[in-house]
Amino acid sequence: MELILVEALKTIFRPQVLIMIILCILMDVYYKKFIGMAGEFWVKRELKKLSDEYLVINDIMIKTKDGITHQIDHVVISKYGIFVIETKQYNGYIKGNDYDKRWLIKNGKKKIYVNNPLHQNYGHVKSLEEILNLPEEKLISLVCIPSRATLSVKSNNVTRIYDLLDKIASYKEEVIGNPNELYEIINNLNITDKAERKVHVKNAREIKSNKDEELKNKCPKCGGELIKRNGKYGEFMGCSN
């Protein structure tokens, strides 16, 4: 038995095996971050195709008067409006609308619910509305999905990456008289300090964790309490309503 254990330990501590174990751990830890960065990269590349009358700022962080920081994936400033873009690298079948608190994502038999990204982006819109002193109708909230997900989302503010430029170009009424000035304001207020950005990420994770805990025993459809029920195949969590 001891000999078998020694041989097993020798195998585990071989350099090649250790490297594979470390890589697997790193992939597990950073997979979501990598996927998110990849999505933002593709959207950033697409926005580079816009003409010079559109000014683009990527990955900005701003602080509002109440001290809350907001990290925004992409902002496009033009005379046709301020486009506030949130990138979501979802995969599978996605179902939702403007008003649902959470959207359904289905991959095969696996179902998960995520917070409505339009609601998240609304906070970003309001933050820019405050610092730029603009009415809300001059800011356009867009959620862009770069992946090949199947969308069943009832919203004019959700677009795929290959429709993004057409979506932006569909706004033809001139509503902004000073796009260059607004571009400079956002650039000057953009937080670039790494330490402050880390604090924002930490706070955002804590808020998400608290929200997830709050919604843990809530029905994703109506918000009612989930209770234990008995079914044909045993106990399951069902809506109390």
Kindly give the residue locations of the regions a language model identified:
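Surface-exposed interaction regions that form or flank ligand-binding interfaces
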Residues: 1-70, 77-82, 93-96, 107-241
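Short glycine-enriched loops at secondary-structure junctions
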Residues: 88-91
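Acidic/polar active-site rim loop that often engages polyanionic ligands
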Residues: 100-106
